[in-house]
Design a protein with these regions (language model features):
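Sec-dependent signal peptide recognition
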Residues: 2-8
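A generic structural signal for short, solvent-exposed coil/turn residues
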Residues: 8, 23, 34, 88-90, ...
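C-terminal motif of bacterial Sec signal peptides marking the signal peptidase cleavage site
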Residues: 13-15
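An ectodomain-focused feature that recognizes extracytoplasmic/extracellular
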Residues: 19-149
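Acidic, glycine-rich flexible loop segments
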Residues: 112-193
Length: 194
């Protein structure tokens, strides 16, 4: 019998000591997988910024900022994206990763802007490009991915980035893909430039 897997995200510690949310309160996400839902507190987060290149049918190339954020209810090794994805080791551990694509013509040096990023596989820019939840059960890690790239995807919703500071990005998420959903607020630490 499958074990109940349910996740949600709450309270994160920001490097500057604040919650990063407007109107008070701690950020949290209600996560549902297979109709089973719960709420979890986030203990740590990290991020990475890069560039995504697109080439259209005529050969024209354009770029956009690609922002990855990883949030977990355990201490992440935030050295880089690979270390943030080290395998989970305990049943209570949960990791949520998202990727946002910015405006057309931006690059890895551009800051992600506040705004709406649609969960629509047909969009190229200002979109949710990836969303996944890692859980641990029966002695192994399971990754549940939302279908964000297949043109026939049933994914709906959006991530609204409401605040970007030197230390953190905050926003609201409401994304559904079949029997999976993530809804609520979030804050993710922004990686410091060397």
């Amino acid at each position: 019998m499958k074990k109940l897997i349910a996740i949600t995200i709450a309270a994160m510690t920001i490097a500057c000591g604040g919650t990063g949310t407007s109107g008070g309160g701690s950020p949290k996400m209600d996560v549902s997988i297979g109709g089973k839902a719960s709420t979890l507190a986030i203990k740590s987060s990290g991020s990475n910024k890069s560039v995504k290149t697109f080439t259209d049918a005529s050969g024209k190339m354009t770029t956009a900022t690609s922002f990855h954020a990883t949030m977990a209810n355990y201490d992440l090794d935030t050295t880089n994206m690979s270390t943030m994805r080290k395998p989970l080791t305990a049943p209570e551990q949960v990791r949520v990763t998202l990727q946002l694509i910015g405006a057309e013509g931006t690059d890895q040096n551009a800051e992600l802007k506040p705004g709406v990023y649609k969960a629509d596989a047909k969009e190229k820019f200002m979109k949710v490009d990836a969303l996944s939840i890692a859980t641990f059960a029966d002695g192994k890690e399971t990754n549940t991915n939302f279908e964000t790239t297949f043109s026939g995807s049933k994914i709906t919703g959006q991530i609204e980035v409401t605040s970007v500071t030197a230390d953190a990005i905050s926003g609201k998420i409401d994304v559904t893909d079949g029997d999976k959903s993530v809804k609520g607020t979030f804050t993710a630490n922004i990686a410091k430039k060397p």
